[in-house]
Curated annotation (Swiss-Prot):
This protein's name: Antitoxin PrlF
Gene: prlF
Keyword field: Cytoplasm, DNA-binding, Repressor, Toxin-antitoxin system, Transcription, Transcription regulation
A GO-annotated cellular component: cytoplasm
Subcellular location: Cytoplasm
All residue ranges annotated as the SpoVT-AbrB domain in the record: 12-59
SUPFAM superfamilies named in the record: AbrB/MazE/MraZ-like
Phenotype reported upon loss of the gene: Deletion of the prlF-yhaV operon has no effect on virulence in mouse infection; the disrupted strain is as virulent as wild-type.
GO terms under biological process: regulation of cell growth
Entry function: Antitoxin component of a type II toxin-antitoxin (TA) system. Labile antitoxin that binds to the YhaV toxin and neutralizes its ribonuclease activity. Also acts as a transcription factor. The YhaV/PrlF complex binds the prlF-yhaV operon, probably negatively regulating its expression.
């Protein structure tokens, strides 16, 4: 454990920083912050002494563009229900056939 670690921590965990400066947020941290992959954002505060405070952005940090898009979709579905079709799972499987996805892999420059 680092010498400057907080003594009142409930749990400690670590992650490695990639050559691109990225890291995977450890599962216990994601669970503690109730992070939803692809939806939530994280706020960082750099404190004196080189420590960093990290927390999940709350609802006050809404994504207004995404919310506007979702309202548009909702209105379109309500106003044009005849255009709404069920998702064809077989077609979806064809679209992703042969794709190998590992959520623990690093994200490459071309992705």
């Amino acid at each position: 454990m680092p010498a400057n670690a907080r003594s009142n921590a409930v749990l400690t965990t670590e992650s490695k920083v990639t050559i691109r400066g990225q890291t995977t947020i450890p599962a216990p941290v994601r669970e503690a912050l109730k992070l939803k992959p692809g939806l939530d954002s994280i706020h960082y505060e750099i404190l004196p002494g080189g420590q960093v405070f990290m927390c999940r952005l709350g609802d006050e940090q809404e994504d207004h563009t995404m919310n506007a898009f979702l309202r548009f979709l909702d209105a379109d579905i309500q106003n044009n229900p005849q255009k709404t079709r069920p998702f064809d799972i077989q077609q979806g499987k064809k679209l992703v056939a042969g794709m190998d996805v590992n959520i623990d892999d690093e994200i490459g420059d071309d992705e």
